[in-house]
């Protein structure tokens, strides 16, 4: 199915591109989210008339995303205290939902869990520093350091009476 993209989409195309996609992808994703229209002569003419409006909307989204990325980068790091073993392994794990919630509380705008890119695409399971990437918009990313600390100090077993 031939469509005209109304928004830039990673690994698919840029705004205004006339591309061929599978019909299910177009019907189930692109059309409902208003990211593309069917490529016809009429739609092509309408798109050419409204192209400057769409590009200005895209520019405003990009500026907003750059502002958000700067705010997250300025945050620098967040600290999480959790229970862990003597060896530094967490009782549980820190996932993208936990990190997104802390970032949202810190910066004042919503960061969704799907925007968080964890190292090795797995939850954080040990004490220490972990570098996390946040996908803000198409090619705009922010970096953040997550410090995980132990909340319980374990006593040495030899001191028990």
Swiss-Prot record:
Protein's job: Binds to the 23S rRNA.
PANTHER family membership: 50S RIBOSOMAL PROTEIN L9
Gene designation: rplI
NCBIfam families: L9 (TIGR00158)
Name of the protein in its database record: Large ribosomal subunit protein bL9
Matching InterPro entries: Ribosomal_bL9, Ribosomal_bL9/RNase_H1_N, Ribosomal_bL9_bac/chp, Ribosomal_bL9_C, Ribosomal_bL9_C_sf, Ribosomal_bL9_N, Ribosomal_bL9_N_sf
rRNA-binding recorded as keyword: yes
Gene Ontology BP terms: translation
Swiss-Prot/TrEMBL keywords: Ribonucleoprotein, Ribosomal protein, RNA-binding, rRNA-binding
């Amino acid at each position: 199915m031939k469509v005209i993209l109304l928004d830039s989409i990673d690994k698919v195309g840029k705004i205004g591109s006339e591309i061929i996609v599978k019909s299910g992808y177009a019907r189930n994703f692109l059309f409902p989210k208003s990211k593309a229209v069917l490529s016809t002569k009429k739609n092509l003419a309408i798109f050419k008339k409204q192209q400057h409006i769409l590009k200005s909307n895209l520019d405003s989204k990009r500026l907003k995303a750059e502002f958000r990325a700067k705010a997250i980068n300025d945050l620098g790091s967040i600290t999480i205290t959790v229970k862990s073993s003597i060896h530094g392994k967490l009782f549980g794990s820190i996932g993208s939902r936990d990190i997104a919630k802390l970032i949202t509380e810190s910066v004042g705008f919503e960061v969704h869990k799907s925007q968080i890119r964890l190292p090795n695409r797995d939850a954080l399971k040990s004490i220490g520093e972990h570098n996390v990437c946040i996908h803000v918009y198409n090619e705009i990313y922010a970096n953040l350091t997550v410090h995980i600390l132990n909340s319980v100090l374990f006593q040495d077993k030899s001191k028990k009476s």
